[in-house]
UniProtKB/Swiss-Prot annotation:
Entry-linked InterPro entries: Ala_export_AlaE
Membrane topology of the entry: Multi-pass membrane protein
Name of protein: L-alanine exporter AlaE
GO cellular component term of the entry, any: plasma membrane
Pfam family, one: AlaE
GO MF annotation: an example: L-amino acid efflux transmembrane transporter activity
Species of the source: Cereibacter sphaeroides (strain ATCC 17023 / DSM 158 / JCM 6121 / CCUG 31486 / LMG 2827 / NBRC 12203 / NCIMB 8253 / ATH 2.4.1.) (Rhodobacter sphaeroides)
Keyword entries, A-Z: Amino-acid transport, Cell inner membrane, Cell membrane, Membrane, Transmembrane, Transmembrane helix, Transport
Membership in a protein family: Belongs to the AlaE exporter family.
Function: Exports L-alanine.
Primary localization: membrane
Membrane-spanning intervals of the chain: 9-29, 75-95, 96-116
Location(s), subcellular: Cell inner membrane
Amino acid sequence: MRLFIIDTVATVIFFTAVATFSELLIAGMAPSEVLATRLLMVPVMVLTGRPYTRWRDWLVRRTAPRNRWSAFLTDILAFLSFQAPVYGATLLIAGASFAEAGTAIGSAIILMILLARPFGLFVEWTRSLFGVELS
C-alpha cells in the first residue's frame, strides 16, 4: 500500500506539473480549462500510476540496464508500451475516432519519449525520499 501511495503521488505531481505547463503555455488553454482538465485526469493517474510503475519495475529488473543509455531506452520502452495504449483508450472513450486517436498518439509519442526517463528518475527520487527500495 505504501508503494501504491508513493508512486501514485509521484505520478500526479509529475504529470500535473508537465501537463499544466503544456496546456497553459503551449496549447494556450485558459487557467479554468487547465484546472478542469487536471482535475479530470487525477482519477486516471490514480488508476494507472502504480500499474505503470509496477510494469516499469518489472522491465527494469528483466533488462537490468547497465548504463545511462540502456536505462534511458528501458524507460522509453516501458513508457511507450504502457502509456500509449492507455492514452489511446482514453481518447476513444472520450469520443475520438480511430484516425483521430492514431494521429494524437503519433504526435504524443514524441513527448512520451522525452518524458519517459525524467519520469522514471522522478519516481526513483520520490521513492528514495520515503526510504523505499525495490529488490
